[in-house]
Every structure is written in C-alpha cells, then in structure tokens.
C-alpha cells in the first residue's frame, strides 16, 4: 500500500472529542524522542505532516491525521519524560490510557522503541500493560540505520527474549529507519491487511 493523501484533522486531550466516525484508527506511541514524528512523516511521504523536534516530550496531544479518506493515523503523546513534572506526567498517562482502553475505533497500536538501547523497564512495563488489557499492538524498532547489523540483531533479540519470559508468543515486530525508509512498505502493507480484514466483517 502507498499513501496518496494525508491531512491533519484535529488535536485534543479528550478522547470524547476525537473524530466521530467509524473509520479504523492506527495509533503510534513511544518514549520521548524515539523518532515518532519522523516515522509518521516517512510513512505518509509528507516531510512536515507531524512536527519533529529535538526537544523530548513535544507531543502532548492526541493528533489525528486522515489517510486516503479511509483510515486515521493517530499520533499519541510520548510516555516517560521526567522533565514534564509529576502532575503533567499523570495527566498524559490518563490521556494515553483513556484513548487506548476506550477508543473503539483503535484497530492496532504501534509501540515505537529505539533499537539503539537495551531493553528498558518503562517499555517492557508498557508492553506488559497492553498485553494484560488485550490491546492489539505491534513493536516498531526505530533508528535501525544507527546500528551495525549485528548490534541491531543483538538488541532486538534481547527485547524478544525478555518478552518471551512471560509471553507465549510475540506480537508483530517491524524494523524501521526513517532516514533510509526501511520498513515503510512492511508497515503500510500490515495496516492494509487489517483494513481489508475489517472490510469483510
């Protein structure tokens, strides 16, 4: 699948104010500065669609983008940014959890993880929470171009092994690089396969 048209629709902090349609939604989330905006821009082919920033914690709203008039790409706030302060972190946590747990249109969640780092407690705890709540999700490793092939394999396998300590099977896993456009086709084809499956129901 190739995206032909993408446009920003709305930003808000209240799931009740999200677009009132039955179109499927695919949400992207990750720790601050994981490369989420760059990945969204890469997937849509629009360099400035999602605002990129070197300042962690920039995205603090639920951002909806309409894709080819048939589905929504949702940019969720990043999690785990300490400098926001306790009250702001709690507010963001509520926004994120309410959207994930209550938004019926959410077809799949993509959890972005910076492949340069070893398994992080905050990521593992979030993935565990998703599993416990039965949320359909995939893991998207970002910034693959920053590592050698052997180091990339080592780090991604470390995450998989950590998850298999408590899980019987792994969710879908994607390796991406916004710089090299690695993983673009695989991610979009996966979304397209879910859309086609939903269309038959």
From Swiss-Prot:
Positions that bind Mg(2+): 37, 59
Cofactor(s), names only, from the UniProt record: Mg(2+)
UniProt keyword Oxidoreductase present: no
Ligand binding (GTP): 30-37, 57-61, 75-78, 142-145, 173-178
Keyword vocabulary terms for this entry: Cell cycle, Cell division, GTP-binding, Magnesium, Metal-binding, Nucleotide-binding, Septation
Residue ranges of every copy of the EngB-type G domain listed in the record: 22-197
Keyword Magnesium tagged: yes
GO molecular function, one term: metal ion binding
Pfam families recorded: MMR_HSR1
An annotated GO BP: division septum assembly
Chain's role: Necessary for normal cell division and for the maintenance of normal septation.
Annotated PANTHER family: ENGB-TYPE G DOMAIN-CONTAINING PROTEIN (PTHR11649:SF13), MSS1/TRME-RELATED GTP-BINDING PROTEIN (PTHR11649)
Family (UniProt): Belongs to the TRAFAC class TrmE-Era-EngA-EngB-Septin-like GTPase superfamily. EngB GTPase family.
Protein name (database record): Probable GTP-binding protein EngB
Native source species: Porphyromonas gingivalis (strain ATCC BAA-308 / W83)
């Amino acid at each position: 699948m190739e995206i032909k048209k993408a446009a920003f629709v709305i930003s808000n902090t209240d799931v009740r104010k999200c677009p009132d349609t039955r179109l499927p939604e695919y949400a992207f989330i990750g720790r601050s500065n994981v490369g989420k905006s760059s990945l969204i821009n890469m997937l849509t082919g629009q360099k400035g669609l999602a605002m990129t920033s070197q300042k962690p914690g920039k995205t603090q709203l639920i951002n909806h983008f309409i894709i080819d008039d048939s589905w929504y790409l949702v940019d969720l706030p990043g999690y785990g940014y300490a400098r926001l302060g306790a009250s702001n972190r709690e507010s963001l946590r509520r926004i994120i959890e309410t959207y994930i747990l209550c938004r019926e249109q959410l077809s799949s969640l993509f959890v972005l993880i910076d492949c340069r780092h070893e398994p992080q407690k905050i990521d593992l705890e979030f993935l565990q929470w998703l599993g416990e709540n039965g949320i359909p999700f995939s893991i998207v490793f970002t910034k693959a171009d920053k590592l050698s092939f052997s180091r990339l394999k080592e780090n991604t396998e470390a995450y998989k092994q950590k998850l298999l300590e408590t899980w019987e099977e792994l969710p879908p896993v994607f390796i991406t690089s916004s710089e090299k456009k690695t993983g673009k086709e695989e991610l979009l084809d996966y979304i397209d396969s879910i859309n086609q499956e939903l269309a038959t129901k």
